[in-house]
Amino acid sequence: MSLASNVLLQASRLGEMVIKRGGATGLMVHRDTKENNLNVKFKFTSENQERIKAIMDIYPEGHKAGALIPLLDLAQRQHGWLPISAMHEVAKILEVPRMRAYEVATFYTMFNRQPVGKYFLQVCATTPCMLRGAETITETIEKKLGIHAGETTKDGLFTLAEVECLGACVNAPMIQINDDYFEDLTPKDVNEILDDLKAGRKPAAGPRSGRLAAEPFGELTSLKETPPGPGFGLQAALK
């Protein structure tokens, strides 16, 4: 195998690994595909153009580049994922170099630079969730949908990915589906959630255990006293 062929093979394998354990962000560089190239045009809808105006009105004169993340997010919500033509359109609107859009889109893993299903299932696979059964949750989804991490169902309804910490460790194991967190999961919960989504129903987000947010099971174990008011702990000279 030539050096060039070996490099291409390694890049391909790296891309597969990144997709499996990083969602649909892909490599940090763009590769033209049938659905993602400069010939595939992107324009914001008239409704979203009104939203863009409202977003940009938040930022002071000379600082509209600060709207880069909100506009990329809006483009992704309109298109379902973030193609390179959408990045170019955002850069054009904000009058910034295209590289600025690339930098943001490749840095934040919430931007999906490859197509994903209608429901993007992101299973947290880091230590707290793993210790609480994340592998079983992933296996349940794979068995239910007939796909593995990094794959999309044939009907385009679901994409599955294993991701890094989503910040809900106390509610492990958990998954993120689009914008919603589903926490304190069991395999039964996962099957019910997937059945609801398949049927067009919206399952209730949050803990499935019956607790509110991240409150402890049973009674409080800390913070039992009324917290002191402002100025507590200050040196006398500072009061």
Curated annotation (Swiss-Prot):
Keywords, comma-separated and alphabetical:
2Fe-2S, Electron transport, Iron, Iron-sulfur, Membrane, Metal-binding, Mitochondrion, Mitochondrion inner membrane, NAD, Oxidoreductase, Respiratory chain, Transit peptide, Translocase, Transport, Ubiquinone
InterPro entries assigned: NuoE-like, NuoE_dom, NuoE_N, Thioredoxin-like_sf
**Enzyme Commission number:** 7.1.1.2
Disulfide-bond pairs as recorded: none
Q: Where in the cell is it found?
A: Mitochondrion inner membrane
Q: What residues does [2Fe-2S] cluster bind to?
A: 124, 129, 165, 169
Question: Which Pfam families does the entry mention?
Answer: 2Fe-2S_thioredx (PF01257)
GO CC annotation, single: mitochondrial inner membrane
GO MF terms on file?
A: 2 iron, 2 sulfur cluster binding; metal ion binding; NADH dehydrogenase (ubiquinone) activity
Required cofactors, per record?
[2Fe-2S] cluster
Q: Which CDD domains match?
A: TRX_Fd_NuoE
Coiled coil residues, start to end? none
The cofactor note reads:
Binds 1 [2Fe-2S] cluster.
Briefly state the protein's biological role: Core subunit of the mitochondrial membrane respiratory chain NADH dehydrogenase (Complex I) that is believed to belong to the minimal assembly required for catalysis. Complex I functions in the transfer of electrons from NADH to the respiratory chain. The immediate electron acceptor for the enzyme is believed to be ubiquinone.
Give the protein's recorded name.
Probable NADH dehydrogenase [ubiquinone] flavoprotein 2, mitochondrial
The organism's taxonomy opens as: Eukaryota, Metazoa, Ecdysozoa, Nematoda, Chromadorea
